[in-house]
Structure formats: structure tokens, C-alpha cells
């Protein structure tokens, strides 16, 4: 019995630690540079991503999804701005920024295509990925004339346990880091 308990503990720990990093780092699901060179001195404005057409998942959990729809755009935008600034971009703004936005600014716009809180009950009682949340985005980078320079899309699955709200917030943070990573790689290429 002692060995069975150890084995179950080992398998649980292995599953837990391997899923913590699942899908967290790395490239976005889709990222395409259509034209242009991005410099770290280029002015970039991050617009809050729209949630108006997002799939909010099961209607039973709509109240949680609506709360996610209110917080996710700001979390995503601020995370992108913070990541870009810390990597050396010198002129990155968002709607809350003070001052004028330069006329030749690139715009990062997009939308949440899915904000599904999943089922907290399934995560608590079943675990192992049951009831996981999912956050998906898509968008584009355009120049000041509206010409598309790049497009992207990405999804982030929750870890499969715990409360829906923090999972969605973490999903938005990770998507923000991955989108910023795409822009950083573009500037470094």
C-alpha cells in the first residue's frame, strides 16, 4: 500500500509540474509578418482587444465569462506594453497613456475569440484537465494608414484545476507575453 501511495504521489506531481509550463512559453499558434521591418524605436500603440464577439463557452458559466470579458482586455494590453518596454522598445503606448500618439504609430489591434471559464466543479472533482478554461485571441499590426503588416492568433488552455477567474487572468498574461515575444522577435530579425 505504501508503494501505491508513493506511485500515485509521483504521478500526480509529474502531471502537475509538467502541465504548469504547458503552452506557456514559445511561439504563437499563428504569426505572420506580411511586410515591413520593425525597429525597437518604432512607435507602437496597443489597443484593448474587443470581447464583443468572443465565444463565452457554456451559458451555465456566463456570469464568470462576462467578468473575464471585462478584465481580460486591460490585462492583455498592459502585459504587452510592459513586456515590450522591458525588452527595449522606446515608444509603446496604450489608450490610458498620457500625451499625444505620434502620427506614424503602428497599431496592434485584435479581438478575443474565446473566453471560456470552463467548469470549476469539474476541475475540483475530476481534475486532470477536466473543465479547463480557454482564452483565444487574434489580431493584426497595421501602419498609420491602416495597411496590415502582420497578423497573429493564439489560444491558451487553463491548467485544469482551481478557480476560473485567476486561470483566465493568467491566460491573458501568457497570451500578452507571447504576443510581445512575436513583436520582439520581429524587431530582432
Task: Please report, for each region that a protein language model flagged, where it lies by residue.
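A structural "domain/chain start" motif
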Residues: 20-79, 155-156, 184-189
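Surface-exposed short loop/turn segments
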Residues: 27, 95-147, 160-162
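Bacterial N-terminal signal peptides that target proteins for export
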Residues: 1-9
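Bacterial N-terminal signal peptides
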Residues: 9-19
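Short secondary-structure boundary motifs at beta->alpha junctions and helix caps
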Residues: 61-68, 130, 142-188
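Mid-chain, structured segments of secreted extracytoplasmic proteins
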Residues: 70-103, 107-111
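Sec-exported extracytoplasmic/periplasmic mature domains
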Residues: 81-89, 117, 180, 184-188
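Generic beta-structure capping elements
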Residues: 47-49, 111-113, 144, 154-155
